[in-house]
Amino acid sequence: MKRRPRKWKKKGRMRWKWIKKRIRRLKRQRKKERGLI
């Protein structure tokens, strides 16, 4: 495991949160599509 500078940790957390939000949005869109069909 390579050691990362402390600055990277915060960026990684923000990215992870953003990814989770996107996944939630995609799931919501799929539910809406199923309801329309």
UniProtKB/Swiss-Prot annotation:
Entry's Gene Ontology cellular component terms: ribonucleoprotein complex; ribosome
Keyword Coiled coil: no
Keyword Ribonucleoprotein: yes
Annotated keywords: Ribonucleoprotein, Ribosomal protein
Domain of life: Archaea
Residues annotated as signal peptide: none
Quaternary data: Part of the small ribosomal subunit.
Family to which this protein belongs: Belongs to the eukaryotic ribosomal protein eS32 family.
Note: Initially thought to be part of the large ribosomal subunit. Crystal structures show eS32/eL41 to be a small ribosomal subunit forming a bridge at the interface of the 2 subunits.
Protein name as catalogued: Small ribosomal subunit protein eS32
Organism: Pyrococcus furiosus (strain ATCC 43587 / DSM 3638 / JCM 8422 / Vc1)
Recorded name of the encoding gene: rpl41e
